[in-house]
């Protein structure tokens, strides 16, 4: 027979246990394939956020809440991305952080929308992503229109380039970025002397670059990933092409110097990263980067802090709604003002970040060096 006091204690313990809940938040990115380093970097950012949140005393839906990260691999493949999205819907996740690139985020977004599950991408830049009319779709970085435009204007107005040759990898990301660069460069008075296309798995660009060489462009613009940019830079050097090399956030990584080897020279590469913090506001971001390096033993690749902020923003909306139910916290997410390590996060009616910054970088001594922050 259980003593009365013990029975009461057991009852209280059981009651407290029943009042706990596990809230599943997913992160999706390429953990395998040519841009696995980007996916792993973002996943690390999500894990840091989850671990910090679980150290706090958070109550949602009247229950003590523990957050669980469901980390999934889409291999940067649209078909795998949609399969993963359906898996997460079936698992009844409360929200999704991801995907990493536009080619996976866009097809997956329809599945999340149909299920009413909020999705915040920390790195998708295709303008199309937030132009589908989905109220569940958000991003915490600037889009390709802003990225490509900034690069085109910089080429014309700061580099004083007159001509450019353009190559894109035909992905939603690469094509969109190249189109925006061409539009801005032409508007600023530049001439596009050649346009060529490849794919996101290619590493041999000799035929394309040989055709470019005859045109003598001031700038070679690449709408693609660092996995392609590295070999392209090596082949440009071998062919004696002296042009500046420009591209977007997917080439603007800490891995580019390793991928390019001796093909990259000081100040040759100009790239733009969606996001950026002015010097006056860098204290929180620098602290995050230090904490990341202590935890993982390496520097961030590019978007880990934006992934961290995306997840923290989602949970902030849950806390404001006092619920992890997507129907209840989605309205709070749409009107959120969250101070993140990358700056203030709030969204416009489409789900784009308001006042998204863009940072331009070059490389010197195999290290990325900031040129300017613009909007």
Question: Can you annotate each of these PLM segments?
Answer:
Residues 13-15:
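N-terminal signal peptide c-region/cleavage motif recognized by signal peptidases
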Residues 1-6, 17-375:
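Extracytosolic ligand-binding ectodomains
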Residues 8-10:
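Extended, low-hydrophobicity acidic Ser/Pro/Thr-rich
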């Amino acid at each position: 027979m259980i003593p009365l006091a013990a029975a009461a204690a057991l009852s209280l313990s059981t009651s407290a246990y029943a009042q706990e809940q596990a809230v599943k938040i997913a992160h999706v990115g390429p953990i395998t394939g040519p841009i696995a380093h980007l996916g792993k970097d973002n996943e690390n950012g999500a894990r840091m956020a989850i671990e910090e949140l679980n150290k706090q005393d958070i109550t949602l839906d009247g229950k003590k809440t523990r957050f669980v990260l469901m980390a999934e691999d889409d291999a940067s493949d649209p078909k795998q991305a949609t399969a993963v999205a359906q898996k997460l819907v079936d698992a009844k996740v409360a929200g999704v952080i991801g995907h990493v690139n536009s080619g996976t985020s866009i097809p997956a977004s329809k599945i999340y929308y149909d299920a009413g599950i909020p999705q915040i991408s920390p790195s998708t830049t295709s303008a199309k992503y937030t132009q589908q009319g989905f109220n569940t779709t958000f991003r915490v970085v600037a889009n390709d229109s802003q990225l490509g435009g900034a690069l085109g204007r910089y080429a014309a107005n700061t580099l004083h380039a007159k001509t450019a040759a353009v190559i894109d990898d035909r992905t939603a990301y690469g094509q969109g970025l190249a189109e925006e660069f061409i539009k801005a460069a032409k508007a600023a008075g530049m001439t596009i002397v050649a346009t060529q296309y490849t794919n996101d798995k290619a590493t041999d660009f000799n035929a394309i670059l040989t055709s470019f060489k005859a045109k003598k462009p001031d700038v070679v613009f690449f709408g693609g990933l660092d996995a392609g940019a590295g070999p392209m830079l090596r082949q440009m050097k071998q062919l004696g092409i002296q042009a500046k090399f420009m591209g977007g956030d997917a080439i603007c990584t800490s891995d580019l110097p390793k991928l390019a080897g001796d093909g990259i020279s000081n100040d040759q590469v100009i790239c733009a990263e969606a996001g950026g913090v002015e010097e006056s506001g860098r204290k929180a971001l620098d602290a995050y980067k230090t904490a990341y390096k202590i935890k993982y033993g390496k520097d961030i690749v590019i978007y880990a802090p934006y992934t961290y902020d995306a997840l923290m923003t989602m949970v902030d909306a849950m806390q404001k709604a006092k619920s992890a139910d997507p129907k209840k916290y989605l309205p709070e997410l749409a009107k959120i003002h969250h101070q993140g390590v990358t700056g203030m996060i709030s969204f416009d009616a489409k789900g784009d970040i308001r006042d998204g910054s863009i940072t331009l970088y070059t490389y010197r001594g195999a290290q990325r060096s900031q040129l300017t922050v613009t909007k």
